[in-house]
Amino acid sequence: MKPETKLTFNILYNKGKLSDQTLLQLYRAMLKPRLIEDKMLILLRQGKISKWFSGIGQEAIAVGVTSALEKDEYILPMHRNLGVFTTREIPLYRLFSQWQGKANGFSKGRERSFHFGTQEFKIVGMISHLGPQLGVADGIALAHKLKKEQKITAVFTGEGGTSEGDFHEALNIASVWDLPVLFCIENNGYGLSTPTSEQYRCKNLIDRGIGYGMESHQIDGNNILEVFTKVSEIAESVRKDPRPVLLEFLTFRMRGHEEASGTKYVPEELMEEWALKDPISNFKNFLTEEGILSDETDEQFYNEIKAEINENLQLAFDEEVIVSTETDELNDVYKNIEYQHFEEKEEVETLRYIDAISQGLRQSMQRHEDLILMGQDIAEYGGAFKITEGFLEEFGKDRVRNTPICESAIIGVAMGLSIKGMKAIVEMQFSDFVTSGFNPIVNYLAKVNYRWNQPADVVIRMPCGAGVGAGPFHSQTNEAWFTKTPGLKVVYPAFPYDAKGLLNTAINDPNPVLFFEHKALYRSIRQEVPTNYYTIPFGEAALLKEGTEVSIITYGAGVHWALETLLEFPELSVDLLDLRTLQPLDTESIFISVKKTGKVLIITEDSLFGSVGSDISALIVENCFEYLDAPALRLGSLETPIPFATNLEQQYLPKNRLNQKLKELIEY
């Protein structure tokens, strides 16, 4: 029944062929997050919660987009998208427990608010850096496409987030690869307090789609029917014809960035203008005017939702404070796996270091049909060092993928593939270039298992090292950037045998692995290597020489410098330990050796301050001090960038100082 008094609404609605039931469902779906927020704001004022990021005024976007997706399609929301979580029907007690840091949440108290993810509800939570999740959406969509699943992925960002380089990279990759992603921009006028006029110069953000050859649509983000109808139509089309689509939703944030910051920077008349466009009150008036929503039904919705909120809040408040031990926390940093050992067979062939890596890659590709290789120039060209030469012909372009120069987003793609249960290897053309992808490695891959029990089954190959006259941007050995980041594993083999076996182990491991390959060893070191597929466990150093007078602990090229230098000390009895993996580190073998010899020299190609060598030295002093007959000595490169000229590079590297340093230790 229509009301006697005509109601006003400031949004033009077109219900089309939508049923009354669908219209009421959309209204109720928007009402639920609004009422939850109303309650949260009360609790905030009462001091019962510490912080709240409001999405009031933006409910139509989260609810409309989520309602247009199928339940098994992934969605990557932001911190204002409460409607995504409620529309996916996450039980409220679990949501409230999550916000309270309780055990019935999704992250064991390790993540707050909306940063968590859940495979059960196909939601992948954001990280505070905003941009990386765009690349992750690309990866999920790529997995759908490779598996020939007619599914789409939706990812949210704000107009402020579009200023990040990750936004460009993710859109670029999605357009080049025709990935079925809906890039949803919530343009709410302000990035915290920065207005759009100071954020970008284009008139509309959808104009950016032109540069990527990408279909783009601008949608009234406060009009639930426009959001739901248009996104439903686009989603259905993209499922049949995979491609990325850029969506700009025009809306407004009616509360502060978070409640403490307020909205004083917003002109009062602007707040008043957008208040008249409230998505819920306008839609309510429309439904009432159309005779679809009665006062009784509306009251019923309110009462049901409020009762659900209060009941589940009480459950969350009554839940005990989460209990965890140091062991519990440490055990969840990495995905626990049972190492699978594959024995090498007697048949061997002499391989260069580079060929052993290539052979390991090839055999792993044959073993794991869901393994995807990605990197610049790795397909037809075979990679900068020709390690993947011939792979394209054997495994096809779907699995051996040239990438744009978009390191950050490609690492995000690898993460997305892992979320879909696939494996990924990313080749950095040079390890120096990993700086362009540093953020997703240390903030996404490294933390995701600890945050919500989602492994990052990703290997990043890192051609590294000096001694090849490549200068400051193609010669770094930057393993220490990653060994100090919990959640990452770091491998650094010195020999062909180890390189192949450890690479196979890295690919089997569901945790993120940085696999360092020294360029100077690629074609200079040869060794007999088993022809079959085999693995070598992480965390086990190799004792290359056994002695009683001095311990030399090193890895990578340092192993070969030590072997060469020891030829000048034929009478010296030396323990030479090749670490092989730096995270996990074989501290047991280090301590056994040092306690036996009483003297230790640690060699690293890195400069010393903050290096792996420095950490090993500290561990030795803490655990073996009473066994030492001399200070634990370290030898590393100069504290300068890496020079290009041959004589300067030789001066920079520690190799030419090794003889003198060893004498110093012997004579102490």
Show the residue positions of the predicted features.
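Active-site nucleophile and cofactor-binding loops and adjacent substrate-binding regions
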Residues: 51-58, 79-80, 116-134, 158, ...
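Conserved acidic/glycine
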Residues: 1-61, 68-69, 249, 255, ...
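Acidic-glycine-rich active-site phosphate/pyrophosphate-binding loop
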Residues: 38, 103-118, 205-206, 380-394, ...
